[in-house]
């Protein structure tokens, strides 16, 4: 398969290099189109008010001065002279669990691929970030990715589906298997951090994500915590169907009291 690989950690991040190498070793034709620097948290942002520069690093790699969404959009709408078969985004250097997916550039790169008609997978390694911990097990996440891509080739998903994959940071031998999960969610984010710069101006840092809230059995949080690879099928229909009836009552009342033109 012809695989387009992107990420949000940047073109030089170890995760994307290990992922691209693993896919090539599995027999796939791989093109990397990724941001020129870390663009974590960029979500689905698309650059519309300035031109975007793309630099070809080698025959199989482009560095783009833009967001993860920019990278995939450019790759699929003119940068490449062929059409890839699938988009794989990652390997992110931390998890994208629960409502993390709203902000994730890793997930958004995959989402853009799906918007433009391709199967798409986002792969994240849920690193533990403990002092003295061994190096992140990117090879484990890459091994999971190539197995998932193989399944997608033989048994495709519906056209509106993205796979959000979160891999525990352990060796492959320590892994307990795959689990299909739903997204959990977190409590409200921690407060922003306030500091004073050398000129006496107040500056702010976004605070850390909130702790787990909905993280019980069946969620992505629970699977990873129990050393399973979490696979969550997601899609981008944001309609809250359960609220349609209630909001319809509102609009009926509003319509009845408005002097609409005939």
Swiss-Prot record:
Cofactor(s) demanded: a divalent metal cation
Enzyme Commission designation: 3.1.3.5
Residues where a divalent metal cation binds: 8-9, 40, 92
Enzyme class: hydrolase
Pfam families associated with the record: SurE
Keywords for this protein: Cytoplasm, Hydrolase, Metal-binding, Nucleotide-binding
Localisation: Cytoplasm
The keyword Metal-binding is annotated on this UniProt entry: yes
SUPFAM superfamilies found in the cross-reference section: SurE-like (SSF64167)
A GO term, aspect molecular function: 3'-nucleotidase activity
Cofactor binding note: Binds 1 divalent metal cation per subunit.
UniProt entry tagged with the keyword Membrane: no
GO cellular component terms, semicolon-separated: cytoplasm
Catalytic activity, reaction form: a ribonucleoside 5'-phosphate + H2O = a ribonucleoside + phosphate
Role description: Nucleotidase that shows phosphatase activity on nucleoside 5'-monophosphates.
Family of the protein in this entry: Belongs to the SurE nucleotidase family.
Protein's name according to its UniProt entry: 5'-nucleotidase SurE
Lineage: Bacteria, Pseudomonadati, Pseudomonadota, Gammaproteobacteria, Lysobacterales
């Amino acid at each position: 398969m012809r695989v387009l690989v992107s990420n949000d950690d940047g073109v030089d991040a170890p995760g994307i290099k290990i992922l691209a190498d693993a896919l090539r070793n599995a027999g796939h034709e791989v093109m990397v189109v990724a941001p020129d620097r870390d663009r974590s948290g960029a979500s689905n942002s698309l650059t519309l008010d300035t031109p975007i520069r793309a630099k070809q690093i080698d025959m199989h790699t482009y560095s783009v001065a833009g967001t993860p969404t920019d990278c995939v959009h450019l790759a699929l709408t003119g940068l490449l002279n062929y059409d890839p078969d699938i988009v794989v985004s990652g390997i992110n250097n931390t998890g994208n669990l629960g409502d993390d997916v709203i902000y994730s550039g890793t997930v958004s790169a995959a989402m853009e691929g799906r918007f433009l008609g391709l199967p798409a997978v986002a792969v994240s390694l849920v690193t533990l970030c403990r002092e003295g911990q061994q190096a992140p097990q990117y090879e484990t996440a890459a091994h999971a990715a190539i197995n998932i891509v193989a399944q997608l080739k033989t048994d495709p998903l519906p056209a509106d589906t993205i796979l959000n994959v979160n891999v525990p940071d352990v060796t492959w031998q320590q892994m307990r298997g795959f689990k299909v999960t739903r997204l959990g969610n977190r409590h409200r984010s921690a407060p922003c951090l306030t500091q004073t710069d050398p000129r006496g101006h107040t500056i702010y840092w976004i605070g850390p994500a909130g702790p787990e809230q909905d993280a019980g059995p069946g969620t992505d949080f629970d699977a990873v915590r129990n050393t399973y690879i979490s696979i969550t099928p997601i899609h981008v229909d944001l309609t809250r169907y359960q609220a349609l009836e209630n909001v319809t009552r509102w609009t009926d009342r509003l319509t009845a009291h408005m002097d609409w033109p005939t």
